[in-house]
Each structure stands twice: as structure tokens, then as C-alpha cells.
Regions:
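Central antiparallel beta-sheet cores of small beta-barrel/beta-sandwich binding domains
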Residues: 17-128
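Cleavable N-terminal signal peptides
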Residues: 2-4, 14
Length: 128
């Protein structure tokens, strides 16, 4: 049995699986300005490998997937049925964390922060 954390959530109606290539649009938590870039998500065994390229900087992360079963949110190994992905990432000396949820229109919406920041920023992934 996989390790899982359970939370009560609403059901999601779109097709699952965060694997793919996406256009990224987000908000910088420090300046409030908008940024754009790309992100690629692939499965790497039981985890996800997530690589962002934004404004000439590469961020590399490892993620866990999540599904809804019996009205409960279960976090565990990467799976094509995942409707959410939780990611820890690094770039040089910078580290951070992020969480994204599949939307009905096929986009992935989430929030992220980085080590030491008191702020949270929003980001949307658009399938390419």
C-alpha cells in the first residue's frame, strides 16, 4: 500500500495526467509582475520530473501525484490518473515548493513559493 495523505476534496471533471509540455504564465511574488516560460513534466519511476524554463533560468523539481478516491484526496506515487501534483524544486541555491491542480479546461493551476519567502504566487500551465 502506498503512503498517502487524505483530505476531503471535490471531484475533478477533466482528463488527468500532468505529463506533457506546457506554456507557463505566472506572477512573481516579489514584484507582482507577470512572467512566461515553459514547463515539461515526465514520470521518473514513482515520481515526476518537472523542468521549468523561465526568463533564462532553469528550475528542476521532483513531484508526487494525487488522486481523488471515495471523496478523499490521496497523495502518492506518480500515476496517469493524477489530478494534482506537489513539487519541490531547486535552481542553484534557490529551493521552493509548488502545488498544481488540474482544471476542467485542461490547464493546471497552482501556487508556489521559495525558501525564506513570506509570499505565495500563482501559476497556470497551458498544454502545448
Amino acid at each position: 500500500m502506498a503512503l498517502a495523505a487524505a483530505f476531503t476534496v471535490a471531484a475533478f471533471g477533466a482528463l488527468a495526467d500532468p505529463v506533457g509540455s506546457f506554456r507557463v504564465v505566472g506572477t512573481n511574488p516579489d514584484s507582482g509582475g507577470t512572467y512566461q516560460g515553459t514547463v515539461t513534466v515526465s514520470r521518473n519511476g514513482e515520481t515526476y520530473r518537472v523542468v521549468w524554463d523561465v526568463a533564462g533560468t532553469r528550475y528542476v523539481g521532483t513531484g508526487l501525484g494525487a488522486v481523488v478516491e471515495n471523496k478523499r484526496f490521496l497523495v502518492g506515487p506518480a500515476d496517469p490518473a493524477d489530478i494534482a501534483i506537489s513539487i519541490g524544486y531547486v535552481s542553484g541555491n534557490i529551493f521552493g515548493m509548488a502545488m498544481y491542480f488540474l482544471q476542467d479546461d485542461g490547464t493546471w493551476e497552482g501556487v508556489w513559493t521559495y525558501g525564506g519567502s513570506p509570499k505565495v504566487a500563482k501559476e497556470t500551465w497551458y498544454p502545448r
